[in-house]
């Protein structure tokens, strides 16, 4: 199984949880040091993991990753950039990087890995979006749009490949206590947590539990769905 963007935050917690449940995990990221540290953390708990360095902003790197990962039965499209810029302040360069990493990379990585899933007659894909895909986000509209694209991929891929035994779902987290989220959103991050029905932010492991469930046999009749793990933020 393959988890992209797994050297920190939600991706890292997801990889660790899969390993605790007995999976052999391939993790990706740009930082080789953090990759090695994540592998070591998994192995010290008795798990199995391999790190593949990949820059998902580079389509050639995406294709190399697919080749190196080999036969993948579970794919977690988690890697993302995180920027907070309102419309009048959004620059073209960071916009392009965001859509390359958040939209183009998961599309073509999934396309490269699907043939072996189809041949095997089974597979599970979980895309990680955001509650921002479902609500207006005035301080980060481009980020919200990129996440909405992932949710659209989920529905289209579920429709296209369900007959091949492949399930595709999305987890849409709410405000989650990762270093990148706290650094990017600052005071607004805590305010978002306070606005959820549960009145708090999430811990990465809480999001990871939902991801692992959707990839597991326990979710065998679940496909094409977006599961909001956002403390009820989008419920009202």
Residue ranges and their predicted role:
Residues 110, 146, 154:
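Active-site helix of classical SDR
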Residues 115, 159-163, 220:
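Alpha-helical segment proximal to the catalytic Tyr-Lys
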Residues 130:
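Residue(s) in the substrate-gating loop at a strand-loop-helix junction
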């Amino acid at each position: 199984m393959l988890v992209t963007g797994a050297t920190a935050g939600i991706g890292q917690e997801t990889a660790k949880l899969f390993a605790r449940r007995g999976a052999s995990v391939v993790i990706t990221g740009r930082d080789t040091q953090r990759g090695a540290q994540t592998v070591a953390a998994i192995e010290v708990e008795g798990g199995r993991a391999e790190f593949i360095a990949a820059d998902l902003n580079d389509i050639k790197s995406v294709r190399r990753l697919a080749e190196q990962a080999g036969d993948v039965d579970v794919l977690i499209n988690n890697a993302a950039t995180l920027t907070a810029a309102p419309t009048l302040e959004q620059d073209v360069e960071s916009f392009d990087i965001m859509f390359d990493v958040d939209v183009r990379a998961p599309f073509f990585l999934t396309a490269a890995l699907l043939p072996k899933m189809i041949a095997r007659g089974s597979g599970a894909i979980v895309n990680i979006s955001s509650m921002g895909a479902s609500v207006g986000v005035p301080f980060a509209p481009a980020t919200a749009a990129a996440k909405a694209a992932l949710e659209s991929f989920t529905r289209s891929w579920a429709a296209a490949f369900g007959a091949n035994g492949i399930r595709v779902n999305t987890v849409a987290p709410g405000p989650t206590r990762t270093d990148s989220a706290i650094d990017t959103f600052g005071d607004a991050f805590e305010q978002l947590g306070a606005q959820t029905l549960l009145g708090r932010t999430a811990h990465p492991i809480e999001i990871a539990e939902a991801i692992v469930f959707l990839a597991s046999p326990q979710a065998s009749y679940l496909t094409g769905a977006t599961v909001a793990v956002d403390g009820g933020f989008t419920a009202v």
